Amino acid sequence: MNKYAVIAVYALVGLTSFLVFLLLLFPVSFLESRIENWAVSRNIPMQVNNLEYDFPTGMEFSELNLLNIRRTETLATLRPGRVDLQPLSLFSNRLNLSLQGATFGGSVQADLRAPLFATNAYGVDLIASDLRFVDFPPSSWVRSMVVSGGADLQLNRPEARGTSAPWIGVLQLEDVDALLGNPAVQDIVLDNLNGKIEFLIQNNVLTIEKSNFKGDALQGTITGRITLGPDQDRTMLALDLTLRVDTAKLGSPLSALLPKKAWRIRITGPLSTPRFTAT
C-alpha cells in the first residue's frame, strides 16, 4: 500500500471517528431540545420532530411546528426540512424548506449569516419558489396568492447600549413576483417588485420608519407599527399604506374600475382579522 493510500485510510478512519464522537457527544434528542430551548428563550415557541444527522455537513427533520406563545396551538407546520452546514464558512448556514400545510405550500431557501461569537448581528438571504397561500377568508377580495422572488433581511443591535437597545432591521425586496387570485375575476399579476423597508423592534413593538417599493404596475410606501402579541389574535396592526398603480399594466378586467390617483389605506386590528380602510 503506497503512502497516499495510507493517508487516505487514516483520513477516513479519523473522519469516521470524529463523526461517531460528535453523535455520542451531541445525540439527536439533545440537539432537538437545545434547538427548542433556544427558540423559546427568544419567544419563538417551536417543536422539532424526527431530527436526523445527514453526515457530514447536514441535518434533516420531518416536521417543524411553530407554536403560539402558550404552546397550546400550532400556527404553522414546515416539512420536510434540511439544514446544510457550511464548515468552510463560520458566518453562514443554509436552510432548505419545503412548506406543506392546509393553507400554504412551496419552498424556501435561506442563507443565514451571523458572526461566530456575536449575538447582536444577523442576516438572512431568502429565495422563495412558488410560495402559495390559499383559502383566504371569503370576505377578502384576494382568495389566493402565489409569491416568488428574493429578499435580504439584516438585523443588528448597537453593542454599547446593551440589551435595552432596539433591534435595527432592513428588509430588501429583490425581484418579487406575486399573483393575486379570486375565482370570480381574472388574476392580478404584480411583477418585479423591488424595495426597501427600514424598521426598529423594541419592547415588543415593530415600528416601520421608512419604506419604498416599486414594480412594473405599482409603487408605494408603508409606515406604522405592529405590536407583537403571544398569538395572531393579540398581534395588533396600525399601518398606513400608500399605493400608486399603473392600472394598464395589471392585466385584469378590474383595471378600469380602479382609481387613477394614489390609494391611501389604513390597516388596523389584529393580525388574524385585519381591517382595511380607505383614508
Where are these regions (language model features)?
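Extracytoplasmic beta-rich ectodomain segments of secreted or membrane-anchored proteins
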Residues: 125-128, 132-181, 185-186
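Solvent-exposed loop/turn tips at the surfaces of repeat/solenoid architectures
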Residues: 64, 81, 86-88, 102, ...
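Terminal hydrophobic membrane-targeting helix
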Residues: 22-106
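Amphipathic hydrophobic-ligand
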Residues: 71-83, 102-111, 136-158, 186-196, ...
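Short, hydrophobic/aromatic-rich segments at coil-to-beta transitions
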Residues: 92-99, 124, 203-210
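Beta-propeller and related beta-repeat scaffolds in trafficking/envelope systems
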Residues: 71-90, 162-205, 248-278
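Extended terminal
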Residues: 1-16, 38, 192-198, 202-279
